[in-house]
Amino acid sequence: VSFFGVHNHSAEGSNLRLRDSINKVPEMIEYAHSLGHAGICFTEHESITSSLDALKYYDSHKDLEGWENFKVVLGNEIYLCTEDITAENKFNNRYPHFILVALNAHGHQGIRELSTKAWTKNSFMHVMMRVPTYYSDLEELMANYKGDIIGSSACLGGALPHRLLQFQDLERANPKEYEKIWQSCKDWIAYMNEIFGEGYFFLELQPSHMMEQIYVNHKLIQLSEETGTPYIITTDAHYLKKEDRQIHKIFLESQEGDRGG
């Protein structure tokens, strides 16, 4: 089975509110194809502005020899929040990442609708423009798009990975209390499976040398086994090749400010 890159960022789509990616849409598609991948998905930071560029480039290549089975898929990396976000509420004042991927044109319509709704609630908070999607917004949308959109738990900036890391030390210090945290993680997964439908929500693992990501990967596999929820492996790509890493680092450091969600 060929790899399909589900979680990727481009300069055209993810640099609207912050410095994030040095990838260019045409280069991403070409490189994924050259590696023999089955396809590539664009999941920008609450933005669908790269979709048109991606579709145009794909349409100009899909009939060429060797491109018959390659697919370009469109998604979005939203900020899935509780509705009590305020500047004073430091604990809940986070903007957890969450991945949406359209399985068809109808699904992409739903992603566009949700993105539009999020932008109507934008506000400037903590040095950058914030664009929240509330859980209630996602529930309302998925009532009409179940089976057309898949969701995933995203990167370390996601709600589930963040919770796993937040209470990591509690696992040894107070196993009884940690069991409650563990159950809350399983409850959150069950909630997502209910919203998206069984088999349409995924736990997201990412290859990394970072101890935090390695820990989260192990815990997500354990949660997958205990809940029967499938997992995917993504690269959360912000640059194409290993040798581009330093260039990407310099790009991020060229502007002060908080990149995080």
Each predicted region: which residue ranges?
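Phosphodiester-processing cores and adjacent nucleic acid-binding clamps
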Residues: 1-261
